[in-house]
């Protein structure tokens, strides 16, 4: 058990942590009072332990390998058992998959070393601001992620890692050279787990992980949370980030907002400013969810002054609830942003900022004359909504948009990929008139969107925002 740091010549020196397996299996004295009461122990037969880590989606494929060959070989070489959550089953509030490793101490370290190496091999296209595929928002990640390790541990293990007065975590940092942080501990409500974030160079992280695994080994309760899916977990879940709100955003507003940011193609827009005014009137969970969404949009380069949010509290609550309940979170994001924009337009809100900055404008704003949301300087002034009507059987909406010939390629994408992805994402059918077939008297092509009201609204929103972006960068 690590003791408190001792004073030597005016400097604090952490007590070294012995990496050899401890002889005693008794519960260490510094375990916090919040430790779970479960009887389940960490070890199985033959000294087996468990390590749960988060893996960025871009690294999962290289860890699994073609047909699962890599992960099978890794298990064979190390003797460990490795389980990953499903491809779209992310840890709440992130786009990272959960990996559970079972094995000896040596196996845990070996497997994690392999995983860390794959995380460091971030593909060039992943580091770009705009995702390679708009159906995979998780491909846009923080470049600093390659220098991080994220480990999920039960509360009891977290207490051992921290140590009395923070002595143990300080010793881990001093001995490894890595920076170690734990997700915030909430007041009142106990979380079953907390997330440990280790940041540093490869060798520093390797050493820190070894020391953390030793603490896992010491805690007889560290095998109490072996789930890899959080889809059905009730109650609060720890935030994957070491600072800020203690709880993860289980309503999926954060990843869906990130998805929408990539879909719209916005990158490196005007600087972000404070936005307390748009949050007035919101409280509780709504405020947390909206703040998370806005923070995510800000991190993706949106100028929050140009959002023009005029959404009422009642409308926001409904939109957020719909997003949380959606089976397709990316589509929910598009609908959520569209709801913000159209509600703002209906209430007469206008986008702030100067001409040339882009707003998350209303769907009806394809022409400045419709509602003035974009203003006279809008690059979409050349586009127009030709009409909205019901399909012949009355079950679907049909929306027609006029798009300048030179901007049609932005909607089509290479080989029609963007158009296909928009359709898959929203569930709407999108058709573009053939080359040379223009709206009479113009050089505009006709885009026809067919689907449910929500689907057509989302598709129309994505198309108009993509056009706005493309016009602005040309």
Curated annotation (Swiss-Prot):
Biased composition (Polar residues): 1-12
Record GO biological process: mRNA splicing, via spliceosome; negative regulation of cold-induced thermogenesis; regulation of alternative mRNA splicing, via spliceosome; regulation of mRNA processing; regulation of RNA metabolic process; spinal cord development
Primary location group: nucleus
Subcellular location, record wording: Nucleus
Motif stretch (Bipartite nuclear localization signal): 26-42
Superkingdom to which the source organism belongs: Eukaryota
A Pfam family assignment: KH_1
Single GO term (MF): mRNA binding
Any one Gene Ontology cellular component term annotated for this protein: nucleus
Domains: entry comment: The KH domain consists of approximately 70 amino acids and includes a conserved hydrophobic core, an invariant Gly-X-X-Gly motif, and an additional variable segment. The third KH domain (KH3) binds a hairpin RNA loop containing the 5'-UCAY-3' motif on targeted molecules. RNA binding by KH3 requires residues C-terminal to the KH domain.
Protein name per Swiss-Prot or TrEMBL: RNA-binding protein Nova-1
Organism: Rattus norvegicus
Lineage: Eukaryota, Metazoa, Chordata, Craniata, Vertebrata
Gene it is expressed from: Nova1
């Amino acid at each position: 058990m690590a003791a408190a740091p001792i004073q030597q010549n005016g400097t604090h020196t952490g007590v070294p942590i012995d990496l050899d397996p401890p002889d005693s299996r008794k519960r260490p004295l510094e375990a916090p009072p919040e430790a779970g009461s479960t009887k389940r122990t960490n070890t199985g037969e033959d000294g087996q332990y468990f390590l749960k880590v988060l893996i960025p989606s871009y690294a999962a494929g290289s860890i699994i390998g073609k047909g699962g060959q890599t992960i099978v070989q890794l298990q064979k070489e190390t003797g460990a058992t490795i389980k990953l959550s499903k491809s779209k089953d992310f840890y709440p509030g992130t786009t990272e998959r959960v990996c559970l490793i079972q094995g000896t101490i040596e196996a845990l370290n070996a497997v994690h070393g392999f995983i860390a190496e794959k995380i460091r091999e971030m593909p060039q296209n992943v580091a770009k601001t705009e995702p390679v595929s708009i159906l995979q928002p998780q491909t846009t990640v923080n470049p600093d992620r390659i220098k991080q390790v994220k480990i999920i541990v039960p509360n009891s293990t977290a207490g051992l890692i921290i140590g009395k007065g923070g002595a143990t975590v300080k010793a881990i940092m001093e001995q490894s050279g890595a920076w170690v942080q734990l997700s915030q501990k909430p007041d009142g409500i106990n979380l079953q787990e907390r997330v440990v974030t280790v940041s540093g160079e490869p060798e520093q992280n390797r050493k820190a992980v070894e020391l953390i695994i030793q603490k896992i080994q010491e805690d007889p309760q560290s095998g109490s949370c072996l789930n890899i899916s959080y889809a059905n977990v009730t109650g609060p879940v720890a935030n994957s980030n070491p600072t800020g709100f203690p709880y993860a955003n289980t309503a999926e507003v954060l990843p869906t907002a990130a998805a929408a940011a990539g879909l719209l193609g916005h990158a490196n827009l005007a600087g972000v400013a404070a936005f307390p005014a748009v949050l007035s009137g919101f409280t509780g969970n709504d405020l947390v969810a909206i703040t998370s969404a806005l923070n995510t949009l800000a991190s993706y380069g949106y100028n929050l002054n140009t959002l023009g949010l005029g959404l009422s509290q009642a409308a926001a609550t409904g939109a957020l609830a719909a997003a949380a309940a959606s089976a397709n979170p990316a589509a929910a994001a598009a609908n959520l942003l569209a709801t913000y924009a159209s509600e703002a337009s209906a209430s007469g809100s206008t986008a702030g900022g100067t001409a040339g900055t882009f707003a998350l404008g209303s769907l009806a704003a394809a022409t400045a004359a419709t509602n003035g949301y974009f203003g006279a300087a809008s690059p979409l002034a050349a586009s127009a909504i030709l009409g909205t009507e019901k399909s012949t059987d009355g079950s679907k909406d049909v929306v027609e948009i006029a798009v300048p010939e030179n901007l049609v390629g932005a909607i089509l994408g290479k080989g029609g990929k963007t158009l296909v992805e928009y359709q898959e994402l929203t569930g709407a059918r999108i058709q573009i008139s053939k080359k040379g077939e223009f709206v009479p008297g113009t050089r505009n092509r006709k885009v026809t969107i067919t689907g449910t009201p929500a689907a057509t609204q989302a598709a129309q929103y994505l198309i108009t925002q993509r056009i706005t972006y493309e016009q602005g960068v040309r």
